Amino acid sequence: MQNVIGIRTLRRSVNEALLRVARGETIVLVRHGHPVAILRPLAEGETHRRVSVTTFRRNLRRAVLVSHRRPIMLTWYGDGAAVLAPVPPDLELEYEEDDLR
């Protein structure tokens, strides 16, 4: 079973999702049952366009759309917290509908 979160759930609990990512988990974000992005830990030395978590939360839909083209580094007080990245083409989801709530 993979870590899958719906966009609506992410909007309500961004901090909890980032704590999970900080512990090393990768989370697949879905909208209407289809994967739209992944939220993963930041690799050492990795650099991307930086967006604060507050801005990400306010502009979640736009951030997900931008992440289709290129990864975005989410920052917390200026430090890299996670990466919002495109969905890998070979990703196969295994989840139950209850996981999306």
Q: What are these model-derived regions, one by one?
A:
Residues 1-6:
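Short Lys/Arg-rich basic patches
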Residues 7, 31, 53, 75-76:
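Nucleic acid-binding interface residues in structured DNA/RNA-binding domains
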Residues 70, 86, 101:
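Short coil/turn motifs at helix boundaries and re-entrant loops, enriched in small/polar
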Residues 95-101:
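Juxtadomain coupling helices with adjacent low-complexity linkers
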